[in-house]
Amino acid sequence: MTDKLIGFYDPVRMKAERKTSETEIKLEMNLRGTGQYQFDTEIPFFEHMLSHISKHGLIDLNLWLRGDIEIDCHHSVEDTAILMGTTIHKQLGDKAGIFRYGHFTLTMDEVLTTVAVDLGGRYFFKYTGPELTGKFGIYDAELSLEFLQKLALNAKMNLHVVVHYGDNKHHVHESIFKALGKALRMAIAQDSAAAGAIPSTKGVLE
């Protein structure tokens, strides 16, 4: 397995690659973008969900992915989350001047979902809501929780997802990924009042 981060910390754009016996991924991400995205993953529903993070988080995302989808999509989704999370963490650098925290409550027809994040350098993930089961094309619905957990772990962030109510599984998924984009946008944004300070009384964030 090889992970390669190109440009280690680049406030404009970061490129990263990951290659294992199960997947090969090329990623380009700009956390302070305009919500532009381009995907080539062979997993249409996954692309649909990632587009919501990009559009609502104003994160430019260019992703090329090839994985062992003849088995299932697990490795492809998991490894993408690992690479995206690692890239988020590295691109934020010392996190000076960012808000650090973000949360958003989003409605998607009959569904109401809240997502809250803390980019403070510590991992925690909690999902509360209906069981995610079934399939969207070749994508197993339960993989969304795998994606979120691995994203939080590798971005070193707290991520709480609460689906308050609603049972249309497509709407539930859309609400989660859209709210995640919105919450990340808030947390990543520069706090002008902070004057570039580290958002922690410790004076440092990992």
Curated annotation (Swiss-Prot):
InterPro entries xrefs: IGPD_sf (IPR038494), ImidazoleglycerolP_deHydtase (IPR000807), ImidazoleglycerP_deHydtase_CS (IPR020565), Ribosomal_Su5_D2-typ_SF (IPR020568)
Compartment(s): Cytoplasm
GO cellular component, one term: cytoplasm
Alphabetical UniProt keywords: Amino-acid biosynthesis, Cytoplasm, Histidine biosynthesis, Lyase
EC number: 4.2.1.19
GO biological process: L-histidine biosynthetic process
Record field: catalytic activity: D-erythro-1-(imidazol-4-yl)glycerol 3-phosphate = 3-(imidazol-4-yl)-2-oxopropyl phosphate + H2O
UniProt key word Lyase: yes
Example GO molecular function: imidazoleglycerol-phosphate dehydratase activity
Top EC class of this enzyme: lyase
Pathway membership, UniProt: Amino-acid biosynthesis; L-histidine biosynthesis; L-histidine from 5-phospho-alpha-D-ribose 1-diphosphate: step 6/9
Cross-referenced Gene3D superfamilies: Imidazole glycerol phosphate dehydratase, domain 1 (3.30.230.40)
Keyword Plastid: no
Main location: cytoplasm
PROSITE patterns: IGP_DEHYDRATASE_1 (PS00954), IGP_DEHYDRATASE_2 (PS00955)
Family stated for the protein in its record: Belongs to the imidazoleglycerol-phosphate dehydratase family.
HAMAP family named in the record: HisB
Protein name: Imidazoleglycerol-phosphate dehydratase
